[in-house]
Design a protein with these regions (language model features):
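Extracellular beta-helix/beta-solenoid repeat scaffolds
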Residues: 119-121
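Short, Lys/Arg-enriched N-terminal segments with co-localized hydrophobic residues
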Residues: 1-9
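Histidine-centered acyl-transfer/condensation active-site motif
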Residues: 140
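Non-catalytic, conserved peripheral segments adjacent to functional cores
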Residues: 10-116, 125-126, 131-133, 143, ...
Length: 175
């Protein structure tokens, strides 16, 4: 009974945030809304191209317990900030294949952190640890987010590139 009450409270709180913050479904899983986009632009160079990006962008991002953020990567660094709900485990695979697990949450004495940085070009995914809970976080990207800089992982590519992380990749990618 206690777990049913907890689940109901968490579901209501998640729905409250989705409604009050006007969050929409995110393509990689969860809900989001952009809340800031810098008016200042900077140039970023890529091979044979020169792009302009906002200096910085920020979103609210909410995951409900069973939802996951699938493996993806960005061409900019992204800071994740914990706001409310249950702890979130973030899985990061760097360009050399090293896996790092970071837990965002309120339990500082247990090693959880309020924010973390995911470096550009690293593959990352996330999940709420307690599947009966939710997590509200903020994501700040600099240089600013642009959907053309977002790459949702291809399972086959990740499995070929990082075979030692097969079970995690299979769980956090589309078949």
């Amino acid at each position: 009974i206690v777990s049913q009450i907890f689940r109901k409270i968490m579901n209501e709180k998640a729905k409250y945030y989705i409604q009050k913050l006007q969050l929409e479904k995110h393509p990689e899983g969860g809900y989001f809304r952009e809340i800031y986009r810098s008016g200042e632009m900077i140039s970023i160079e890529e091979p044979k191209k020169n792009f302009k990006r906002n200096v910085s962008t920020s979103i609210y991002f909410l995951l409900e317990g069973p939802q996951i953020s699938k493996f993806h990567r960005l061409k900019s660094d992204e800071l994740w900030h914990f706001y409310d709900g249950g702890s979130v485990k973030v899985y990061v695979i760097d360009e050399e294949g090293k896996l790092t697990e970071i837990i965002l949450g309120k339990k500082i004495e247990e090693g959880e952190v309020f924010q973390t940085v995911i470096k550009k070009n690293n593959w990352f995914a996330a999940e709420v640890i307690n599947k009966r809970s939710f997590a509200l976080i903020g994501c700040t990207v600099s240089p600013g987010f642009d959907f053309s800089d977002f790459e949702l992982a291809d399972r086959k590519y990740l499995l070929e590139t990082f075979p030692k992380h097969k079970s995690l990749i299979s769980e956090f990618t589309k078949p």
